[in-house]
Amino acid sequence: MLGITDLTAGLNSLQFEAGVEHKHESLLPLVGRSHILMLNACAHCIYFCRLLLSCRQKEAGTGNPFAAHRIPLASRCERLRVSIIGGGNLGKQIAHCLIDLGVIRAEDIRISTRRPETLQDLQELGVHCAYDNAALATWSQVIFLCCLPSQLPSICTEIRDHLKKACIVYSLVSGVPLSRLKQLLSHSSIIRPDYKYEAKDGALVHGKKRTITANLKDLSVVKSTSIGIFQKEGICVLNRFIETSMYAALNMCSLQGLSSKEALTLLNALIPQTQPLDLASSLLTPEAFVSSEFISSLSDESPFPWFDLCTVQSKETPFSEYLARSLWLRTGLEELYLAAFKTP
């Protein structure tokens, strides 16, 4: 459970809108906009962690709702160590969503915040809460940055020398572009979803009265957060989040000691086949991810090269071109996204 109950639910006179003066009513849509942005951010964090975790599973039957595969992994490790820097509303919501939807175990989540005493509900669930950004960076495989923009430079200074090459920094800090993050961290495994909001009729009412976690247990709401497509809420991720997630998954496969052939077998097993298409034309191949010039040097036994996630978000890639012309893949990834929200 989220641990926080809205005692004012159903009491109109105690709702936020009731205390707003008429001259400020035009600003009320900003509240709904904030809710929708947070809903989408949490949903995409869940999908991303599910995808990475699926690349760390030893075999079927481990509680992962994604389609099962049985490729033995070198490290034989199923855990994904996730950290959150920033104990404000967004950081807390991400932690609760990861736990309540069964994505990450509480003991595999750490939060660094200046006031860990305010996170008692998460600590009671088993989340380690402290104020030590450097130690958190050393421990983590994924770090969600949920701090204020003004705090970012000092935080980056604290963590950049402690980041492992494979650690993915996932930034939800507004107003700080990817190029600036790369400069501050001297790191290439960075993801920064770039959200565009387009107000539409009825967009601000949907799911607003429920918690983020409750919304993400509702399939109709989950569908509204689908990546890369304008839905009725008017949210779109602009910077190739789908492509970046897949390249991050390939990096995780390489970290696990999988060859390129094994990595593709894993991803093909994850992506649902939703239509009766020719099997050969509906499978990922090396050409979907690397250039034709590199194919000749890539054997089935060798791993994929290590992909720079910053470059993937800023330039056209073989996968972005392949995705654009492959209806089966877009449909399959949509189904894979929805599968991330099915609790074990």
UniProtKB/Swiss-Prot annotation:
The lineage of its organism: Eukaryota, Metazoa, Chordata, Craniata, Vertebrata. Keywords: Oxidoreductase. Pfam families: F420_oxidored (PF03807). InterPro entries: NAD(P)-bd_dom_sf, P5C_Rdtase_cat_N. Probable oxidoreductase. This is NADP-dependent oxidoreductase domain-containing protein 1. Its EC number is 1.-.-.-. It comes from Xenopus tropicalis (Western clawed frog). It comes from the Eukaryota. Belongs to the pyrroline-5-carboxylate reductase family. GO terms for molecular function: oxidoreductase activity. Transmembrane segments: none annotated.
